[in-house]
Every structure is written in structure tokens, then in C-alpha cells.
Design a protein with these regions (language model features):
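Glycoside hydrolase catalytic-domain context in secreted enzymes
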Residues: 1-393, 402-417, 433-824
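Extracellular/periplasmic metallocenter environments
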Residues: 399
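Extracellular and select intracellular beta-sandwich modules with Ser/Thr-enriched
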Residues: 419-423
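Short beta-strand edge segments in extracellular beta-sheet folds
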Residues: 424-434
Length: 824
């Protein structure tokens, strides 16, 4: 395996050297000082700590001061701090492993660690055959082979220690879906033997899961009475060890909550039979994703429900009043700490809507609030405002969101199984929120889950719908300003208000406009930080001469992915598990400071696709199976990222729920599921944070690639949601031919779909810089090409992004450009 890995790395290096960028960032090495943004370590630790979820505890936690602890599992040293790929390839200035954190706690006199056991692990890891191998792109290890622990070794450790802590790790990532096999979704035989040996020798065993996604926990039932505590620590970034110890020792009371349902078996998940397809996946579960399915049709198949998480204290909930406003409901309630320790709680509000003719999930998250630390006995009152539109259902036949007649019951509590009724609201007759255009029509019929008689599960055929997309596009063609010749206007003049956008655009040739709709061509563009994700805007001498600076991009959700030492943040699932938007915003405000330091204008984050199935490799980047929680946490991240003048780029729009064959895979989904589940989080995020940019997904939706999808970009984003930011592709899109317009293909097809910017800019990974698309330029306003108006439309959106990002005080009399030409 090690020889194969070395050969693969060599091949990767040779390929990347020839690709002039390509995936060369994977090979980047950090250079420069080990810079740490002031306050970043504390922010990472706080976020990672609050995201830790306590699933089981018989009283062993928090560990008593001076407790004698034996730590098992190689992940105490070889911790998975983050998942793989563009969302995790960060070079942190430091990392704190659990082993290091336990050692520090011992030095401070808080714990006594089993030194003999630690030495056994260190000697085993030092052997060449047992050293961790990090693999290569798309072939990273999902686990590290565990050290066998014999009953005798466990007994020796138990003779010196009172409590065992077993750490088990898993990882997946971009181009690397989890697999339903041992070493990935399931435990290995060695790990099972480890648990058997340790639980047989110790009366108290704490199991810690270092994972970015849900794994099989059916074994927990078989260990009932033998496992004292179960902790989901996730990938906590560079402060993982410190965050874990702060919870285990009671420095903070655990307050994380699950963002996904943990089922009895993998096959219990409704998408399991329709995940992993090489050509397509039918979203047969429809709107019944995650808890929407389990709480409606299979509550008995749940090990740990959505929103669940224990604390070291207890809380009670008290309903207040429900008040109807013009377009919302206002619900008041109280939370009280009824235990003996201080702690935080997440108050979760769920709505149970009338079944009606459309069928509804038993419960849907309608709102939530994270309390501050409540002292024992302390009581706090809260108010949640629920927009009526947010609890409406989409009627596919009518093409509108509706509130069906009947009673809407609201429940407040600490999980989806909340018991306290917070109020009931009655709708006398059905209410509509207005007709919408049908989008992304199904092209091949398939069978979906629906609600039958008496609320029982039933099947229904999703029929093909015909939409005249050509007429829709032709009826909304942008009007061109036209080329009027040189006027000596710079972009700085526009930014300062001395000239208008149209005045500037009228000077630009078709070639200039085309350059504004594409990136430089490769990753690691020769502007800004080394190892950047690419550049757009002022990428040609002609545009730079007109005062258009280049805009620098970088991944990603877990920190800046450049050739420098940058902070490694907790993974998306960990952040969402905190259920604390203010905390997430504060963390990304620190990331925004780091963007300024390293000259990055656009952070390609957050990733916010739905956790449709636990095997998706990039679930660690994303937040939840629920769109409301996903949208709220993403909005907090965006507000933080944009706090210092930079841009967030939310992604991947939409239905990018699988890594296997992601560039070719077709997500076949009903319009109701698309709108209620897979677009809803983006809608919430855009409404609450106005992200400056959005990235399309690699996959198709009902036969149309997202980067060529007019309905996603124009009908929904621009038309329905009023989005004014920049729409860009993911890196390297697929060749495509418009079925509606003969001869319109590739970049012309994308521009006609109103996707503003192609990144990194070239179809060829051999590209080492910008090269004009002469075919597109030569066909402007001609058969088989786009109109000048369409080209201006996309270029205008790019220019607006450049002004926003590269000019200080863009309406000031003297707008000053930021330095975007320097290398850091």
C-alpha cells in the first residue's frame, strides 16, 4: 500500500506539473510563518466544544478531578481533524491531538493518564508498518488500522486506571464517498475486539467518535451496560483535543445536538436504496428526508433522534403564548435549568401541520434558539417568530406554496420528539403565497414515497412535465447597452460614482466582456496568495488598463486553502451541531480577518448541501439533513466571512449529494422535494445574509447540468429570490449543448443560462493562463451564439462583484483600489 501510495503521488505530481494548476493545490506545501490570527484559537476551540454531542452518559462524565484515565485508540495521536479535499486541505499552524490535550491536563493536575499504555501505543506507531499513510486525492484513508489490544493488555491498564477512553476515527471527503463496509461506515473487527477487551476489563468506558459524518452505531445496543458514555466529537479542527478535554472534564457542559437522525441500520435510511448510482439517483424518498421520514413512518427505527444531545444538567420548557401577526406567528416560551450544573440548552420549535391533500411530515423544524449559560435554577424567556411562508407546503399541481386548512400544532423541547405544546393555530381555508413558474421539470418518470390513507406510506409516480424553456428564455432576453467606443472611463470612476455602469460597459469590446465571464484559466493564478483557487475580473491587460483588478478566490469551509499556514476550523457538521449562529458568525469573523491578511477576496464557503444520505463523502463540509438549520448556520457563516469586506460563496447549488461520479450524475427529483428540501436552505441563507457569490454544483438536476440550468440561475435565484450576487460555476464544468438553441454550447450555453462566471476559466487542465474563447466572441449576435445583451448581463454581475470587493468606499469621491496584484 505504501509503495502504491508513493507511486500515485509521483504520478499526481507529474500530471499536475503538466496541468498548469489543475489539482496542483493538493501538492502545495505551506510556506512562511506559522501565522495565527489573534483570538482564532479561542474561537475554534469554543465552536468545536459547543458542537460536541453527548449521546450516552451513566454519570461517568464529567471526569472527576484526579481521575485515573487510560486512553485507547491510535486516533488519540492520529486524529482526523477534518475531512478530505478542497473543504479540508488546510495547513494549520498547529494542531492539538487528544493525546496532547490529555498530557496537558495531567500536567495541570486535572487527570492522571496511564503512561505505560501510552508508551505501548507510541512504540507500536513508531514501527514503519504501522505509520499512518495519508494516501492521495480521492484515495485517502477512511480509517487508520487500529492497534490490536489483547484482554491481557486491557486488564493491565485497568489495574492502574479507573476509566477507559476509547477514540475511534473516520474520514471521507471530496471524490471519496463513505462505503457501507468495515473501516468506513462500520467498525472493523479489530475495533470491535478493542471495545470487547476494554469493556470487559473496565467498569467505566467512554467512547469518543472522531468522525465528520454519521457512522453505524448499532453496536452500542449490544454494549448496553458496558459503555458508560458515548461522545460524538466530530472533526474539531486544530483545537480538537482541547475542545474534547473541555467537555470530558466538565470545563463546559456538553450542549451540542444532532443535526441528523441516527438510525438502527444503514438500510433504514430512506435514500439508501437510491444512493451511489453511477449515472443517476432517483430521490424516491421525496420530501421525507432524515427525521421527516423517521418521525412520520418509522420512529421505531431510530437510535438517536434529530436534535438529540445530553447535558451535564437538566432543563425544562414552559409554553407561553402564540400570537398571530400579519405574515408570521410569534411564539413565547421559557427555558429553566433544573439541574445542579450550569449549562446551555437548545430550544427547538417544531410544527405538526395538518396532513391535508398534499401529505406532510409528522414534524418539521420551525425555529430554534441557543440559550446563554444558565445557572442552576435560572429561567429565561424567549420569543421565536415563524414566518407563515416558512411552514407552507409546495403544491406541484398548482405551482404554489400553500397553507392547507386545519390545525397547526407547535412543540418546544430539546429534540424532534419535544413534548411541550407551545400553541395551536387554525387555518380556516387554504392560503396561497402566489403562483410560481414550474422549474427543472422531471424528464424521466420515477416512483416516490408519499402519504397514503390514514398516514401510511404509499408510492406515487412522478410524472414528466413539459416546460417551454426556449420561450421562457426568449421572453426575458437582456437588452444590450451596445459598444459605443472609448470614453476613458475606469472602473474606479464607476466605484466613485463619477460614471455609470452602462457608460463603462459601452466601452468594452465583445472580447473584454467575454473575459469578464471567465476566470484566469487555472488554479494558483499569478495574483494574490500562492496556492489560490483562481482569479477573475481583471485577468487581461486590457481590463487591468481600465482599472479592473483581479479578484482572488480560495477554498474553503474549514479555512483558507492556500500555500501558507492558516487556521483549520471545525467541520461543517461540528459547527451546525452547536446550533449557535452567533458562535459560527464569530468564528468566521476571525476567518475574515485571515482573508485580509493573506489577500483573499472570495472564500469558497460555506458548503450547505443537505445530508440526504450518511454515505456522502462531503457531509462533513455540510450541515444537516434539515434545510432550516442548514440555511441559518450558513447565513451566520456568510455574515462572518463578509464582515471585513470580503465575499462568501455559498455552494453547491444544488442537489450535490453524492461524490461518486459527481460530474456526470443526474439527481432526479420532484419539484416539491427540490423546493422544500434542496433549495430551501439556500433561499434562507440568501434572505438572511446576502452572500456576494454562489457556486453551482457539478451534477445534473433532471437531466440538466447545474452550470447550464436557466431555471436555477434565472427563474429561481434572480426571479423569485431577487438574488443580486455573482453566480459562478464549480471548478471545471462539463461540455454541453443546449437542447433548445442549436449551436449554443459550452460557455455560450452557460451564459444563456445566466450563470455569470466560469471557474477557473478553461476546459483544458493544461491551461496556464487566460485564452479568449474566439468561437464565442465570433458568434455574438449571430446564429449559434449569445447576444451582446446576454454577455453584458453576466459581465455586469462580475464587475459589480469586483467593485464590491476591490474598492474601498465604492461610492466615495475617491474610491481606492485594494492591492490585488501582489503575491503573499
Amino acid at each position: 500500500m505504501k509503495l502504491l501510495s508513493k507511486l500515485a503521488r509521483l504520478a499526481q505530481k507529474l500530471v499536475d506539473n503538466g496541468l498548469g494548476g489543475g489539482l496542483a493545490q493538493e501538492m502545495n506545501k505551506p510556506v512562511g510563518e506559522r501565522y495565527v490570527t489573534p483570538g482564532m484559537g479561542e474561537a475554534v476551540r469554543a465552536a468545536a466544544s459547543e458542537g460536541i454531542v453527548l449521546l450516552e452518559n451513566d454519570g461517568v462524565l464529567p471526569l472527576a478531578r484526579g481521575a485515573r484515565v487510560a486512553v485507547f485508540g491510535r486516533c488519540q495521536f492520529d486524529y482526523f481533524y477534518v475531512g478530505y479535499g478542497s473543504g479540508g486541505d488546510v495547513h494549520p499552524p498547529y494542531t492539538v491531538s487528544p493525546a496532547a490535550a490529555f498530557a496537558a491536563a495531567e500536567k495541570e493536575g486535572r487527570l492522571t493518564c496511564n503512561a505505560a499504555l501510552r508508551k505501548v501505543y507510541e512504540e507500536w506507531r513508531a514501527r514503519s508498518a504501522n505509520r499512518s499513510d495519508d494516501g492521495w486525492w480521492g484515495h485517502w484513508p477512511m480509517h487508520y488500522p487500529e492497534m490490536p489490544v489483547s484482554p491481557a493488555l486491557a486488564a493491565e491498564a485497568a489495574a492502574e486506571s479507573d476509566v477507559a477512553v476509547v477514540i475511534i476515527g473516520r474520514a471521507a471527503g471530496e471524490d471519496r464517498d463513505n462505503k457501507p463496509e468495515p473501516g468506513s461506515y462500520y467498525l472493523t473487527r479489530t475495533e470491535r475486539d478493542l471495545l470487547d477487551a476494554v469493556t470487559a476489563a473496565f467498569a467505566k468506558t467512554v467512547v469518543v467518535l472522531d468522525c465528520g459524518n454519521i457512522i453505524d452505531l448499532a453496536w452500542v445496543k449490544g454494549c448496553k451496560g458496558r459503555i458508560s458514555a458515548l461522545v460524538y466529537a466530530w472533526h474539531g479542527g486544530m483545537e480538537s483535543g482541547n475542545a474534547l478535554l473541555s467537555v470530558l472534564t466538565g470545563e463546559i457542559s456538553p450542549c451540542g445536538k444532532l443535526t441528523d437522525t441516527i438510525a438502527e441500520q444503514y438500510t433504514d435510511y430512506p435514500a439508501a436504496r437510491h444512493f451511489g448510482g453511477k449515472k443517476y439517483n432517483e430521490y424516491a424518498e421525496d420530501i421525507y428526508v432524515g427525521y421527516r421520514y423517521f418521525e412520520t413512518f418509522a420512529p421505531e427505527r431510530v437510535l438517536y433522534p434529530f436534535g438529540y444531545g445530553l447535558s451535564y444538567t437538566n432543563f425544562s420548557f414552559e409554553a407561553g403564548e402564540l400570537v398571530e401577526e400579519e405574515a408570521a406567528l410569534c411564539l413565547r416560551f421559557a427555558v429553566q435549568n433544573t439541574g445542579e450544573r450550569a449549562g446551555k440548552e437548545v430550544a427547538q420549535l417544531y410544527v405538526s401541520a395538518p396532513r391535508g391533500r398534499l401529505g406532510k411530515p409528522a414534524r418539521v423544524l420551525a425555529g430554534f434558539v441557543k440559550t446563554d449559560v444558565l445557572a442552576p435554577g435560572q429561567r429565561r424567556e424567549f420569543e421565536l417568530r415563524v414566518p407563515l411562508y416558512s411552514i407552507a407546503s409546495f403544491d406541484e399541481a398548482a405551482g404554489e406554496y400553500v397553507l392547507e386548512a386545519g390545525e397547526y400544532a407547535f412543540y418546544i423541547g430539546s429534540s424532534v420528539r419535544a413534548q411541550v405544546c407551545a400553541g395551536r393555530w387554525h387555518v380556516g381555508r387554504e392560503r396561497s403565497f402566489g403562483r410560481l413558474a414550474h422549474i427543472c421539470p422531471v424528464q424521466k418518470p420515477f416512483t416516490r414515497l408519499c402519504m397514503g390513507e390514514g398516514g401510511a406510506p404509499a408510492q406515487q409516480t412522478v410524472s414528466v412535465r413539459r416546460v417551454d424553456l426556449r420561450a421562457r428564455i426568449e421572453g426575458a432576453m437582456p437588452v444590450a447597452v451596445g459598444f459605443r467606443g472609448e470614453r476613458g472611463i475606469t472602473l474606479q470612476d464607476v466605484a466613485a460614482g463619477r460614471a455609470g455602469e452602462d457608460d463603462f460597459i459601452s466601452q468594452l469590446s465583445d472580447a473584454d466582456l467575454e473575459a469578464l465571464t471567465r476566470g484566469y484559466g487555472c488554479m494558483n493564478a499569478p495574483f494574490g496568495s500562492h496556492g489560490n483557487g483562481g482569479a477573475f475580473g481583471g485577468i487581461t491587460p486590457a481590463l487591468q488598463a481600465r482599472g479592473v483588478p483581479p479578484v482572488i478566490t480560495a477554498d474553503g469551509p474549514s479555512g483558507l486553502r492556500v500555500s501558507a499556514f492558516t487556521a483549520l476550523l471545525p467541520c461543517g457538521t461540528a459547527l451546525a451541531s452547536a446550533w449557535n449562529p452567533a458562535l459560527v458568525q464569530a468564528l468566521y469573523e476571525k476567518a475574515a480577518e485571515e482573508m485580509v491578511h493573506f489577500g483573499v477576496d472570495v472564500l469558497l464557503a460555506p458548503g450547505m448541501n443537505i445530508h440526504r444520505d450518511p454515505l456522502c463523502g462531503r457531509n462533513f463540509e455540510y450541515y444537516s439533513e434539515d434545510p432550516l438549520l442548514s440555511g441559518k448556520i450558513a447565513a451566520a457563516a456568510v455574515r462572518g466571512i463578509q464582515s471585513c469586506g470580503g465575499a462568501a460563496c455559498i455552494k453547491h447549488f444544488a442537489c450535490n449529494n453524492q461524490e461518486t461520479n459527481r460530474n456526470k450524475n443526474d439527481s432526479r427529483v420532484s419539484e416539491r422535494a427540490l423546493r422544500e428540501i434542496y433549495l430551501k436552505g439556500f433561499e434562507i441563507c440568501i434572505a438572511e445574509s446576502a452572500p456576494a457569490a454562489l457556486m453551482t454544483a457539478y451534477n445534473k438536476i433532471n437531466g440538466v447540468w447545474c452550470h447550464y440550468n436557466y431555471d436555477l440561475a434565472a427563474t429561481v435565484l434572480r426571479g423569485e429570490w431577487g438574488y443580486t450576487g455573482l453566480i459562478m460555476t464549480d471548478w471545471w464544468m462539463q461540455h454541453g449543448q443546449s437542447p433548445e438553441f442549436a449551436g449554443v454550447k459550452d460557455n455560450a450555453y452557460r451564459i444563456r443560462a445566466r450563470v455569470d462566471l466560469y471557474m477557473p476559466g478553461s476546459f483544458s487542465r493544461m491551461c496556464k493562463g487566460y485564452k479568449a474563447d474566439k468561437k464565442l466572441i465570433g458568434r455574438v449576435d449571430r446564429r449559434g451564439g449569445v447576444t451582446r445583451g446576454e454577455l453584458e448581463y453576466c459581465a455586469r454581475n462580475t464587475l459589480r462583484a469586483v467593485i464590491r470587493l476591490c474598492f474601498a468606499g465604492n461610492k466615495a469621491e475617491q474610491a481606492e483600489p485594494k492591492s490585488a496584484f501582489r503575491r503573499v
